[in-house]
C-alpha cells in the first residue's frame, strides 16, 4: 500500500531534523523556501542567494554534526536556512531588525555560527588557520564559498597555501553563475566547463564499501583511490583545482538533496587525507520565478512588497550614474571601474549604454584601484565606484599606487555612514579616518543632487591627487535653492544674523538637521570639503561663533572635528568646539531610529547635547 506523503508544517529543532527521512526533508525544503519568501515580503532581505542554497545547507547540517563540525559561509548572508534548522526558526521573522537575528552568521547569537563575516573571500583563510592550530582535531570545518567570491585575491592566496600545506579541509564551491549580479572573470568561464569523471565516483563508491571499515584498511583504500584518480587525470587532464593539489569532486546538482547528501557522506571520509573541493551547481533564486530568471541581481536583496521595487526613485548613486552618462557623451575619455556592485551602485544602464567606458572587475577591490591607476597613467579620466566598507580593503593600493603618484582618480564612495540592517561589517563610518591618513587625498561629501553633480564636475576638472566623493544610499534631495561653491568651499545651509552657535556637518544628515534647526537660533554650515577646505574661510567661521558643534556620522578617530579643534588651538581661537559623532565601533544592526538613538546621533540626542 502506498504511503501518504508526509507534509511538514513546522520547522523541527536540529536534533529532530537529523532523524528525518528523505521524503520528510524534501517537504521541509518546500517549507524553508516559503519562509524565505515570506521574510522578503515584509522587509529587505537576501532573497535569491538563500533560495538557491536551501538543499545544500540542509545537506551539510544533515551529514555533519553542528556545532562539533563547523559550517562557515563566505560573506555570511546565505545563512537563513542554516539559522532556521539550528533552532532559530521561531525568530527568523526578526532577521535584520533591532534586537532580532543578524542577517549574517553571528557567533554571539548561536554556537552553530562559527564566525562573523560580511566581506567576500576571507572564509578560506579563517578556516585554514583554525584547522591547522585548533587543538580539537575531531572537528571538521567546512567553508562554503561562491564561484564569484573564490575569484577574490584573498581566496586565491588561501587556496595556494591550503594546497601547499595539504590542510585537511573540505571546501564547498557554491556555483550559481552569479555574484550579486552577473559573474565576470576567466575563472568563472573555466569553472563552467568543469566535470568530474563518473568512473572516479563509481570506483570510490566500491572501494569505500569494501575497505572503509577499519583504520588499517582505510590506508589501503586511500592508496588505491589515489592511484586510480591519478590514472583518470592522466587521460582526462587535471582541472584548475586539481593542478593546485586539491582532491576535486563535482560538478553535482546542489539543488538535488538526495544526491548532495550522498556525495557529502562519501567525501566526508576522504577529507582527513588532504584538501578537498566539492563543486556544486545551484540555481540562485530557486522557488521564486522572477528571482530564478533574474540575471541582473534585482532580487539579490530587496523587500518584495516595496512599492518602489520597479520605480526610478532618485538615490545618490542613480544621480551620480546619470550625470556620468552625460559626462561621457561630452568626453569619451572617461573610464569607470566597479568591483562587483554594478546594479546596487546604479550603474547597470550606463554599463549597457557605454560598454567601452565601463568595467566591472568582479570582487577585486585592490585590483580595481590599481587598475584605475594604470588607466590614469594612460591619461584616461578614471572614476571608481565603490562601497565605503569595501574601499578599506584597498588601503595599500590607495596609498602606494594612487596617492603617492598623485594620480587624479575620482572615487565615488557609496554607502557611507551607517548601513543599519546590514550591521558592523557594512557600516561606512571609517573611510574619512583612514583616507585622511593618506597624503594628497581630497575628501568631499554631498548632501543633495546639486552638490553631487557639482562635485563630480570639480573632480573631473581636477588635475592632481585622488578625489573622493562620499554619499549614502538614501534618497537624494533635489533642492530648489542651489548654492554655488568652488573648490574647497563650505556653504551655509541655514544662517541667522545674531547666532553665536553653529553646527558644522556634511552629507545626508544636513537635510535632517536643516528641518530641525528652522525654529532655532542656530546656524548650519555644510562642510562639503572635509579636507582641502579654504583655510581662511574656515578660520573666519571658527572666529565668528562661541559654540561650535561638529556633527558627523563617522567614527570618532581622525574625523573633521579633530582637525577643527587643532586648527582653533593653533590659531589661539576662543571658540568651544564639541564633537558629536560615533564613539562605539560595536554598533550592531537594526532599524535607523534605534541605531541612531543608541549612538546618540538622532535629532533628539543631538539637540539635547546642544541645549546642555
Swiss-Prot record:
Positions bound to Mg(2+): 147, 176
Cofactor note: Binds 1 Mg(2+) ion per subunit.
Broad EC category: transferase
Keyword Oxidoreductase: no
Pfam families: DXP_synthase_N, Transket_pyr
Residues annotated to bind thiamine diphosphate: 77, 118-120, 148-149, 176, 288, 365
GO molecular function terms listed in the Swiss-Prot or TrEMBL record: 1-deoxy-D-xylulose-5-phosphate synthase activity; magnesium ion binding; thiamine pyrophosphate binding
Superkingdom of origin organism: Bacteria
Catalytically driven reaction(s): D-glyceraldehyde 3-phosphate + pyruvate + H(+) = 1-deoxy-D-xylulose 5-phosphate + CO2
Alphabetized SUPFAM superfamilies for the sequence: Thiamin diphosphate-binding fold (THDP-binding)
EC number: 2.2.1.7
Gene Ontology CC annotations of this record: cytosol
Pathways per UniProt: Metabolic intermediate biosynthesis; 1-deoxy-D-xylulose 5-phosphate biosynthesis; 1-deoxy-D-xylulose 5-phosphate from D-glyceraldehyde 3-phosphate and pyruvate: step 1/1
Gene3D superfamilies per UniProt: 3.40.50.920, 3.40.50.970
Keywords: Isoprene biosynthesis, Magnesium, Metal-binding, Thiamine biosynthesis, Thiamine pyrophosphate, Transferase
Residue ranges of coiled coil: none
GO biological process: 1-deoxy-D-xylulose 5-phosphate biosynthetic process; isopentenyl diphosphate biosynthetic process, methylerythritol 4-phosphate pathway; terpenoid biosynthetic process; thiamine biosynthetic process
Cofactor(s), by name: Mg(2+); thiamine diphosphate
Keyword hit for Metal-binding: yes
SUBUNIT field: Homodimer.
Database matches in PANTHER family: 1-D-DEOXYXYLULOSE 5-PHOSPHATE SYNTHASE-RELATED, 1-DEOXY-D-XYLULOSE-5-PHOSPHATE SYNTHASE, CHLOROPLASTIC
Similarity comment: family membership: Belongs to the transketolase family. DXPS subfamily.
Protein function: Catalyzes the acyloin condensation reaction between C atoms 2 and 3 of pyruvate and glyceraldehyde 3-phosphate to yield 1-deoxy-D-xylulose-5-phosphate (DXP).
Protein name per Swiss-Prot or TrEMBL: 1-deoxy-D-xylulose-5-phosphate synthase
Organism: Malacoplasma penetrans (strain HF-2) (Mycoplasma penetrans)
Amino acid at each position: 500500500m502506498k504511503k501518504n506523503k508526509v507534509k511538514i508544517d513546522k520547522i523541527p529543532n536540529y536534533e529532530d531534523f537529523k532523524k528525518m527521512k528523505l521524503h520528510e526533508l524534501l517537504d521541509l525544503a518546500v517549507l524553508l523556501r516559503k519562509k524565505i519568501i515570506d521574510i522578503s515580503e515584509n522587509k529587505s532581505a537576501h532573497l535569491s542567494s538563500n533560495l538557491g542554497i536551501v538543499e545544500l545547507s540542509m545537506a551539510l547540517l544533515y551529514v555533519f554534526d553542528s556545532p562539533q563540525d563547523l559550517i562557515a559561509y563566505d560573506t555570511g548572508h546565505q545563512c537563513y536556512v542554516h539559522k532556521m534548522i539550528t533552532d532559530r526558526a521561531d525568530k527568523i521573522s526578526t532577521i535584520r531588525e533591532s534586537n532580532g537575528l543578524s542577517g549574517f552568521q553571528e557567533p554571539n547569537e548561536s554556537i552553530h555560527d562559527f564566525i562573523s563575516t560580511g566581506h567576500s573571500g576571507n572564509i578560506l583563510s579563517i578556516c585554514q588557520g583554525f584547522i591547522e592550530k585548533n587543538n580539537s582535531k575531531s572537528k571538521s570545518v567546512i567553508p562554503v564559498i561562491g564561484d564569484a567570491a573564490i575569484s577574490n585575491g584573498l581566496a586565491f592566496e588561501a587556496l595556494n597555501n591550503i594546497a601547499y600545506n595539504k590542510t585537511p579541509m573540505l571546501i564547498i564551491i557554491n556555483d550559481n553563475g552569479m555574484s550579486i549580479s552577473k559573474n565576470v572573470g576567466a575563472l568563472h568561464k573555466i569553472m563552467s566547463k568543469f566535470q568530474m569523471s563518473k568512473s572516479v565516483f563509481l570506483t570510490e563508491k566500491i572501494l569505500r564499501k569494501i575497505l572503509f571499515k577499519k583504520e588499517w584498511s582505510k590506508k589501503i583504500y586511500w592508496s588505491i583511490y589515489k592511484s586510480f584518480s591519478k590514472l583518470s587525470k592522466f587521460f582526462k587532464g587535471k582541472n584548475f583545482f586539481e593542478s593546485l593539489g586539491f582532491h576535486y569532486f563535482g560538478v553535482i546538482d546542489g539543488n538535488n538533496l538526495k544526491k548532495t547528501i550522498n556525495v557529502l557522506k562519501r567525501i566526508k571520509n576522504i577529507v582527513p587525507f588532504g584538501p578537498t573541493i566539492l563543486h556544486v551547481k545551484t540555481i540562485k533564486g530557486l522557488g521564486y520565478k522572477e528571482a530564478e530568471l533574474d540575471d541582473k541581481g534585482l532580487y539579490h536583496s530587496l523587500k518584495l512588497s516595496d512599492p518602489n521595487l520597479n520605480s526610478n526613485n532618485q538615490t545618490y548613486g542613480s544621480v551620480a550614474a546619470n550625470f556620468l552618462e552625460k559626462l561621457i557623451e561630452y568626453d569619451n575619455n572617461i573610464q569607470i571601474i566597479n568591483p562587483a556592485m554594478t546594479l546596487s551602485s546604479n550603474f547597470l544602464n550606463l554599463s549597457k549604454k557605454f560598454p567601452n567606458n565601463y568595467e566591472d572587475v568582479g570582487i577585486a577591490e585592490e585590483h580595481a584601484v590599481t587598475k584605475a591607476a594604470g588607466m590614469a597613467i594612460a591619461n584616461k579620466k578614471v572614476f571608481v565606484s565603490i562601497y565605503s566598507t569595501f574601499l578599506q580593503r584597498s588601503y595599500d593600493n590607495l596609498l602606494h599606487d594612487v596617492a603617492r603618484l598623485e594620480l587624479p582618480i575620482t572615487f565615488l564612495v557609496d554607502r557611507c555612514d551607517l548601513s543599519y540592517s546590514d550591521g558592523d561589517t557594512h557600516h561606512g563610518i571609517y573611510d574619512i579616518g583612514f583616507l585622511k591618513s593618506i597624503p594628497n587625498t581630497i575628501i568631499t561629501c554631498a548632501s543633495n543632487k546639486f552638490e553631487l553633480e557639482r562635485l563630480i564636475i570639480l573632480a573631473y576638472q581636477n588635475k592632481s591627487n585622488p578625489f573622493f566623493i562620499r554619499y549614502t544610499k538614501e534618497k537624494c534631495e533635489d533642492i530648489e535653492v542651489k548654492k554655488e561653491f568652488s573648490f574647497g568651499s563650505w556653504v551655509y545651509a541655514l544662517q541667522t544674523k545674531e547666532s553665536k552657535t553653529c553646527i558644522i556637518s556634511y552629507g545626508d544628515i544636513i537635510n535632517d538637521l536643516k528641518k530641525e534647526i528652522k525654529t532655532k537660533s542656530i546656524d548650519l554650515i555644510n562642510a562639503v570639503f572635509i579636507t582641502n577646505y579654504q583655510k581662511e574661510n574656515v578660520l573666519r567661521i571658527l572666529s565668528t561663533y562661541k559654540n561650535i558643534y561638529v556633527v558627523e556620522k563617522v567614527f570618532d578617530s581622525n574625523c573633521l572635528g579633530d582637525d577643527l579643534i587643532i586648527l582653533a588651538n593653533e590659531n589661539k581661537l576662543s571658540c568651544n568646539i564639541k564633537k558629536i559623532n560615533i564613539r562605539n565601533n560595536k554598533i550592531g544592526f537594526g532599524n535607523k531610529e534605534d541605531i541612531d538613538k543608541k549612538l546618540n546621533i538622532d535629532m533628539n540626542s543631538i539637540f539635547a547635547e546642544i541645549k546642555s
